[in-house]
Each structure stands twice: as C-alpha cells, then as structure tokens.
Amino acid sequence: MKITKKRLSQAVVTGLAALCLPLALQAASDDEHKYHQLFEDNCASCHGSDHGGYLAPALNAETLKGRSPTALRTIIMAGSFDTLMPPFYGKLSDDNIRGLVSHLKLTPKLDNPAWTIDDIKKSIKVYVKDESTLPAKPTFKIDDIDDIIGVAARGKYGRGEGSRAIFINSKTHQKIGEVPTGTAAHIIEYNPANPRWAYVKTDTAEIFKVDLYSMQAVRSVKTGFNGPGIGVSRDGKYILAGSFVPHNAVLLNADTLEPIKTFELEGIDPDGKQVSSDSGMIIGTPFDDIFAIALENAGQVWVIDLKEGFPVTRITNVGRHLHDAFLTHGGRKLMIASYDDSIVAAIDLKDRKIIKKLEAGCVPHVGGGSAVVVDGRTLGFGTNFGDCDKTVVSVWDLDKMEVVKQIPVDGGTESPAAHANAPYVAVDIISKDRRARTVQLIDKKSLEVVKTLDVGGHAYFPEYSADGKFLYISAGYSGDQVVVYDSFSLEKVATIPMESPAGIFSHGRVRYMTRGLSPDELAQRDGDLKGAKK
C-alpha cells in the first residue's frame, strides 16, 4: 500500500510538473509579448523597432550592459529634458517600468524584420472611398495654396492625440487644418503636379495622403516600422518611401498608395564590406523622372529610373553614413552629407557620378538644405552637428564646387533656412544648455552672424513662408509652440500653440525646389526644368 501511495504521489508530482512547465513557459512568453508591446507602443518610434536606435540611442542587451536597472528606471520615470524623451512617471506603472527595463536588458538587437509587399498592401486604409466627392477648391479662406505651411507635431509621447500634421495660413498665422496621425509626424511632402495633395510620413513609417482642400486624410499605408525617407516624383505619380527598419524602400502609386515594387538596400560599403543598409534621404527632382536614395550604411546613392522595370544605377563610395541632401542647378546636382567623413559629396544626376567631395565641418547634417544666389554666384549652406570643436556653417560656391567660407556659430546646427526674398539664412543651434533655445541669422552678403534669436523651448527647424516675409521656428518639445518672426525686422509677430512641434514645411518648396532659390532664378539659370533628356 505504501509503495502504491508513493508511486501515486510521484505520479501526481510528475503530472503537476508536466502541467506547470508549459504554463510557466506560457507565462514567460506572455510577459515577453507584453513588454515587447510596451516597447513598441512607447519607445520604438524613437529607439527603433529592432532595438537598434533611430532618433534616439539603441536599447538592447549589448548597449545596456553594465547599466544599473535603478538608473534606467529613473531615466524612464523622469525623462531627459534635453532630448525628445518625456517623463513616463504616471503614464506607465512602476511594475511596467521595472518589467520594461528587464526586457530591454535581455533583448538583443533584432535581425532585420520583414515587412513585405503583401504586408504593405494589407496595411492600406481608405478614409474617403470616392475622392470625386471632395471639394473642388479649399474650404477655407486662403489667397494662394503656397501660403500653406505644414508642421509635423510629434506629440509629447511621440504618439496620441497631440501627434498630427498641423496646417497654417502663413499670411494670417492661423491654423486652417489638423490631421491626426496617431504617432509622431516627421515629414510633409507636397505633390508637385497637383497642389491639393500632401503626404505626411510618421516615425513609424506610415504615410497619410492628405487632401489640403478639405484638410483630411483620404487614405494611409504603413511602409515599414521606422524611417522618415520619402520623395514624390516630379509628375506626381510616384512616391518612394524608405525605412531604417526594415532595410528596404518601396515604390508606391501616389494616388492609391498601392505598392508597386520594393528595393532591398544592400551593397558594398566604402571599406569593402557587403552590408544591409538603412534608407537615408530620398528625393525626387524637377530635372528628370527619377528618384535618388541614399544607402546610409553602404555609402551608396542609387538613382532609380521611373520607366519599365525601374532600373537602378548605383553610385558607390560616396561616403560613410550618408543621411540628408538637397538639390541645386535645376535639380541636376545633388549635395549629400556624409556624417562619418565630415564631407558633402556633389553628385551629377545626369552623368550619375560624383563631381567632388567638399569639406563640411563636423558631422554634417544639411536638413532640407539651403542655397541662395548672391552677386551671380549660387551659394549653398551646410549645417553640421558639430560633435567636435569645429561648430561652423559651411558655405560652398555650387557653380565651382569649392568651399567659400566656414562661419563660426554658437554650437552644432541641424537645419538651415533661406528664401530669395529674405536677407538672412537661419540656422538652429543644437546644445544641451540654453543655446538650444536659439536660432542664429547669417547675412547672405557678408556671410557673418548678425543676430541671435532667443526663441525659447528647444528651437529648431526654421522655415520661411512662401513669400519670404515671415520666419517660422518650432519651439519644440519644451516650448510647445511655433514662433513667427518678421523676416526683416526679426520682431516676433505670432505664436501658435501645439504639442511638441518639429519639422516645418512650406508648400512653396515645390516651386523653388531648394529653400533660398526662386522659381525665376531656376528658370533663368537652368532653362526648361520639365525635362533633361534631349
């Protein structure tokens, strides 16, 4: 009897163990899924869905090795005031914060996750089924559609009610429309062939097709997990969207947002290694029916022809860590920044080759770029993060492709703004102290800093109105407003409240291509911009 009871007890214990083991595994799996989702919902839009970094540092087992869980919890709870990261105390529970820290310290950088053409197709959402029902003209008072300025409002937490594209009449400085985007809006592109359409891309790689006449999204598509890259072709028929995660770009029908073709971004980098690459800048050009895209990690620029098969020309050994760029000479020449080489490479998009590599300060970040014509010369202005002692704005003669001057400024810089009708080039100062509140003004003729504006908050992404009369500046995530200045007197004329404003995009960009040039100058200097092919 005792033996029978003993065997029964053993059987019960064994059975319970067999039952409990999968339950324990399931609980662990459930926890892993829970904290993965917490990361996706609260962190990934800045830190990258693959835990490899994006706007903010990588968060994974390798990068967090040796970091105290207590210190990490403190950062999550309190935020980091000189960055985009807000305090999560009160938004996430203490248990969730502790679990998230543990999850981050155990999770490796993920392999390049897939987001296929079928995934893209399935992600399309249609909000207006019959676009013929949309109004034939704007439903609000505006003299010229180019007077519209769009602002990418991130929202405090990079998602939620404050995340939206906000559109403003730059003559009156009044909001005329808001389009919720769910997650942080990053960039706004306008259709060069049809002024009613805008395309808003978020940090989570969603694209919203926006009707500017009725100020509403008509459809959207998710093109990846992270990455701001987007361009619209000169005929308005195509969009090219690139991702940091996954490492690809997708060609879309600009009307329907249906995917046409994906491009896997990989190649041999300047050091001879075969690499898979993030997408850097993407740009359409008035010069030709092409797109140019930077492969950040491979150091290549690809030129995609918009004809049957969409063939690709690969321009190699451009530079290490390519990011942003701007166009000049009617869109034939591309100026692209190389972070790690501290140069800007000039590329001829007709001949598909590098013209020259120009000195560009330290960690150049040219933003949307700026170029002005002064005394018959086309001058380009290049900002740079300045992660060294050399905090300058580079000025190049874009006709001769040579450095004219490097202008000392108060810190690193991120995005220059210019206009043909305004006297100054505005540059935003990036810093971890009060300098981050400021924007400096460079006189176009003397090439000297002549004034510093104390905008407040975290001032960045200056942009002129289409007529050049007003300068718009985001006061950012600690200012929660856009501040407007008279372009000549530099007096403050308006403030426009919104949650964590970032990039500012004038509708006038489609006419002058690069900020600081005018349509008349382009036509006079470069002839007919409608075609390059003879």
Go through the PLM ranges and name each one.
Residues 45, 50-54, 59-111:
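Extracytoplasmic electron-transfer domains, predominantly the class I c-type cytochrome c fold
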